[in-house]
Amino acid sequence: VGLHYQIHRGIGVHHAEALKRGQSLPVNIFVGGPPAFTVAAVMPLPEGLSELRFAGLLGGCRAAVHYSRRLPLPVLAEADFCISGHILPHLKPEGPFGDHVGYYSLKHDFPVLQVEAVHHRTGAIWPYTAVGRPPQEDTVFGDFIHELTGALVPQVFQGVREVHAVDAAGVHPLLLALGSERYTPYEAQRRPRELLTAALHMLGTTQTALAKYVLVAAHEDAPGLRARDVVAFFRHLLERTDFERDLHFITRSTTDTLDYTGFALNEGSKLIWASAGEKRRELALEVHDLPSLPEGFGDARCAGPGILVLRGPRHELGRNETDPRMEELAACLAHWPQRDAFPLVVVADDAAFCAADFDNFLWVAFSRSDPAADVYGTGAVVRARHWSCEGPLLLDARIKPFHAPALEEDPVVQRRVDALAAPGGPLHGLIE
């Protein structure tokens, strides 16, 4: 069977060691069992902390294991199924399949597991979860992880008070964080200094290292602000951003395996957007006096305070190609009287859908763009390797030819599930 394992999940470390020794890596895949097993499997644990130990800690007792002379690894006694085998030295194409970001992952070569045994309990149940654009069933895991790890955040990331990997954006594409800005308390104007150190720390360890857009605000500027209040967070950030100072790109970096917006598989860019200080601008909720836009752009809509969404022409360029039409749009907006009131402009294929609600905006804007390739700006320049602009900031969130296709629900299956949840159905009251 194909062994699709994503980067920064830990198994690659063990696989690399086995290859170094010239050995095939033994693998046990456990399915089902107590809920603590499932939570431990998706928990972003530090390297060296066993999922078995964490499952025991979470479940309140040691996880029972069974040792067999026929298997090199122990078997979880309470698991419903155990698939045992070794990783073969060659690769095979795997995919496509639906993912939790809301797309069909494309076909790629991955390691192959030679299955040698399958064990199961009496009356075993094979659990599964439906995937697709969030929120889905696995959203509750993300909420639970935030609840479990919230108190640990300041200990793991010095100077960080709160983080929120935004589920509506697909989790890894967007990370919001509140931090402290204490490096130079004697300065008259607060500016992001400690926040940048904290952002780089978050991109250097744990699962936050896979974040694509890292938006960081200073707790001192708004003590009541919370990272989980996404609309308020964006408003706070857009009111304070200095576009000549606050955007920091990391190019050709490591990205999540499921993100197809970047340079290649597992490779793309990141953007640290860190703002601190006093409010700079008033944001608008209504669009006025928009200049005549370049051909193909239109249907202006407001997605939130200071966020303008435009329909754009179909994207037909290749990876990492600068779109002259986006640069033309940026130049056009330089003459817009409301340019400061709408500091963020998102270009999408369907402006009405993107602006219909804030979750739509988050999903489209951050799951369909790569910072280095898709961020433009009015008056953009590069000085001393630092990209800046006068504003507004433009984000090209159109679907590109090399993107994974969006996951679409099968209406026949959807009706069957709805029937199960209807009054009198076996799942009535359990699902909505």
Residue positions per predicted region:
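Internal mixed beta-strand/loop scaffold within catalytic domains of large alpha/beta enzymes
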Residues: 1-32
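Charged, compositionally biased interaction regions
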Residues: 33-432
